[in-house]
Amino acid sequence: MIRRVLPHGLGRGLLTRRPGTRRGGFSLDWDGKVSEIKKKIKSILPGTPCDVLPDTSHLPPEHSDVVVVGGGVLGLSVAYWLKQLENRRGGMRVLVVERDHTYSQASTGLSVGGICQQFSLPENIQLSLFSASFLRNINEYLAVTNAPPLDLQFNPSGYLLLASEKDAAAMESNVKVQKQEGAKVCLMSPDQLRNKFPWINTEGVALASYGMENEGWFDPWCLLHGLRQKLMSMGVFFCQGEVTRFVTSSQRMMTTDDEMVTLKSIHEVHVKMDHSLEYQPVECAIVINAAGAWSAQIAALAGIGKGPPGTLQGTKLPVEPRKRYVYVWHCPQGPGLETPLVADTSGAYFRREGLGSNYLGGRSPAEEEEPDPANLEVDHDFFQEKVWPHLALRVPAFETLKVQTAWAGYYDYNTFDQNGVVGPHPLVVNMYFATGFSGHGLQQAPGVGRAVAEMILEGSFQTIDLSPFLFNRFYLGEKTQENNIM
C-alpha cells in the first residue's frame, strides 16, 4: 500500500514526513491497481549464453503497477527485488523499458566490473558488502529452472589504494570506518608495499590500503543476462522503447511557512516504440527512474527542476553523462597474475585482464578536461599524455607496454556529491530514483534495488538506511560526500 505523505526531511519550513508513512491515497490507487491484475501462467524460459539478449521489441502492456525506466543492472535489480519481496502481498505487474536493447551505450556493459568496499561512507560500504554476498551466492538468487548455473567469472583480488602524504590521514580514517562496517581491509606502509608487491615504485606513497576479502572483478554482461532471465521467469515485462512523456495530476498543499507547493502523481507513461512514430500509453502507479546517465532527462519530463530557482520545485536532478575511457595494454614484463586493482595517488588505476599479460585501466579527467559525452569515441592521446606517465612511474615495467584496444563508457555522474540518488522524489510522489552513482552503480546495484523495493513496499528502508541518498539533499545543499571515487 502507498500512503499519502510529504517526503522525509524536506526542511526549510516545508511540511515534513518520514518515509515510513508513505502509503495509500493521492491518486495512487494501489489496491485498485493490484485488483486489476489477472494471474497468468508464465512459461519458464530456458537459459541462453550470457551474450544473447532476448527480443523485447513487442508493445508494452496497457497498464503496469510499476514502470522501470532503464534496463541496466540498477533498474533490473529494483524489478527483481519488487517481485522477490512482494510474494508476501500478491501479484504485481512490473514493466522494464529500455531504449537501447543492444546495451551498446549502457554503463553496465561498458564497465570494468569491479567491486570494492573501500569507501569513505558507511552506506556505500554496506551496499558493497551486501553485493559481494549477492554475487557470491548468485545462483541462490537468480536460479531459473532448466537454465544452466550462472558463472560471473569472478576474479577475487583486493583493491590496492595508494595515498600521498597529504591524503594519508584521510585514508586512515576511511579504513577505520570500513573496519567498523565489517570490511576486511589493512593498511600498508611503503616498506610493506615493496615486500608484497616488489614491482611497485613507492615514490610519493605514504600509505596504502588493501582489501583482503570480498573484492575483485566480474563479468557485468553475465550479471545483466542473469537478471533479465530471472525477471522473465518471474513474469516481468520488457519493452524496447523510449519514455517520452508522463501524464500527471497535481494537488496544491501549504507548507509550514505558508508557501504553496504542488504535489504531482504520474498516472501514465508514454513509450515511443523503436523505429516508429507511434507511442504506447502505459497506466501505472509507480515509476522507477533508473535511466542512468540520462536520468535527469526523465526527471525533467515529470517537471522536476522546472520551478523557480532556489525552490524545491526548481531543484534539478544533478546527474549527467560523463565519458570515461578504458584502455587495454599488453606487457609481458608486467606485474603478473598476483596483480590487484591498483588506484594510484594520481587517480590512474589498472588491473590484470585475463591470463595473457594483459592489463586494463584508465583515469578520470580533471573537471576542466571533461570530454564531450555526445559520442563514445576514444581519445588515445589522453592515455599517452595523462595515463601512461603515471603508470610507468608507479610500475617501471609499464614503460614498455603496448596498447591493444580501448573503449569508452558513461558514468551517471552526480555533479553535486558523486553519490547515488535513491528513493522517492519529494514532490513527484510516485517517482523513485536509482541513479547517480558516478561509477559504482554496477557493484552496488543489488543493495540499491533492494532498498528501493523496500521503500515502495514497506514505506521505509529496512536493511540499509539510505536516507543520506534521498533527493531532498540537493535542495537543502547538504552533500553526502564520497571521497573514494575512481
From Swiss-Prot:
GO BP annotations, alphabetical order: mitochondrial respiratory chain complex I assembly
Enzyme Commission designation: 1.-.-.-
Cofactor names: FAD
Transmembrane segments: 66-86
Domain of life: Eukaryota
GO-annotated cellular components: mitochondrial inner membrane
Record GO terms (molecular function): oxidoreductase activity
Localization (cell): Mitochondrion inner membrane
Functional summary from the UniProt entry: Required for the assembly of the mitochondrial membrane respiratory chain NADH dehydrogenase (Complex I). Involved in mid-late stages of complex I assembly.
Assembly mode: Associates with components of the mitochondrial respiratory chain complex I.
Alphabetized PANTHER family for the sequence: FAD-DEPENDENT OXIDOREDUCTASE DOMAIN-CONTAINING PROTEIN 1 (PTHR13847:SF287), SARCOSINE DEHYDROGENASE-RELATED (PTHR13847)
Protein name: FAD-dependent oxidoreductase domain-containing protein 1
Species name: Macaca fascicularis (Crab-eating macaque)
